From Swiss-Prot:
Entry's EC annotation: 4.3.1.18
Matching NCBIfam families: D_Ser_am_lyase (TIGR02035), PRK02991.1 (NF002823)
Record-level GO BP terms: D-serine catabolic process; isoleucine biosynthetic process
Entry similarity comment: Belongs to the serine/threonine dehydratase family. DsdA subfamily.
Cofactors (names): pyridoxal 5'-phosphate
Coiled-coil regions listed in the entry: none
Enzyme class, UniProt record, top EC level: lyase
Domain of life: Bacteria
Catalytic activity entry: D-serine = pyruvate + NH4(+)
Keyword Cell membrane recorded: no
Organism: Geobacillus kaustophilus (strain HTA426)
An MF annotation (GO) of this entry: pyridoxal phosphate binding
Name of the protein described by the UniProt record: Probable D-serine dehydratase
Pfam families, per database record: PALP
Amino acid sequence: MIMAAEEVFWRNPKYHAFAQAIRTIPLRERDVKEAEERLRRFAPYIAKVFPETQPAHGIIESPLVRIPNMQRRLEKMFQTNIEGDLLLKCDSHLPISGSIKARGGIYEVLKHAEDLALANGMIAIGEDYAVMASEEFRQFFSRYSLVVGSTGNLGLSIGIIGAQLGFRVTVHMSADAKQWKKDLLRSKGVTVIEHLTDYNKVVEEARRQSAEDPTSYFIDDENSIHLFLGYAVAAFRLKKQLEDMNITVDETHPLFVYLPCGVGGGPGGVTFGLKLVYGDHVHCFFAEPTHSPCMLLGLMTGEHDRVSVQDFGLDNKTEADGLAVGRPSRLVGNMLENVISGVYTVDDSTLYRLLAAMVETEEIYLEPSALAGVAGPVRLFRDSAGQTYVEENDLKEKMKNAVHICWATGGSMVPKGVMEAYYREGMRIETMTGNCFSEGR
């Protein structure tokens, strides 16, 4: 079924209790807390140069919202009862770059900036980092360059923050990157190099170019611990959001989180953070396009980055540009092979249908890749492998108290015309399936 690019749900047979799984992971909670502390140090700078972050005092965070109308629509569309509450984590609306990549990407650039500033005696820990907005600092950072390979959103986050600090930034974009993302980066003074190859080849080329320049810093989407830790911080923020909403996560109130997955750094970091916070009470599932199930194949075979989707006859072509990755992260696969609960795949047509449904029911606009997570609760309840997971983990009687969080990874930066075209495509597909939304909300 995978090789036929059909939707599948796979439960991970290597999934273990977290106390056991963490023994083979070289990171601990203190590493995530250190990343959180660094982001706090930079908050005055962020608030100064990105006014949209001032209400949150320079902390880059997204809303967590209940989506009951969408929950009912999903039940109707797929003839499936979803037990528990459905929520959306709106990283699609993160300030600065409008995607989950604003977490890891911005964090790694800030860490590099801090390292350079400290090493050159420009600043000391404890001082006000808002001073980095000065021309003196911009001149200093302009002596250095940043290089990254991206399908789109990581390039956006690194390009925007890097250019703001004063770095010379080069973003290598794969063939599937959307034109508007390239245009936006160029408008910020970022050098965009377009490639005709797919994501993994682009990263290889970006890495090679960066290695030739001693002032260059390469942000390695496939293997970066710093990106991973930037994403992991999200879990501690989410814990507070759930508490503020009076939502309990414990033995009898399980939490299910559905995360769109490209190379794996974003969902991997978030999963690690969530496991540190909630242990075995949280269950994390990755969502991939049917044509680009790289993490699924890496985990299933145990070969991780040694296999690609092309090895299995798949073309890695999907409208979910952020997830169009043919080979998974070795770092994430190795670290989390006993931590990820499972992986499911979603067809592009399903993504478009869900995109239109989210607009219709909740008036929330997401890009296609962000909808991969929204399919999760349906798949858990509808697919036999999902139900086997529930039964094997003694969750059946607890599902009525379950909390389901779909992680919306991007969307708010999409130009209006492009978003309208996405919506029309979703409505067109929905009409063809004979499931039109005309019954109202």
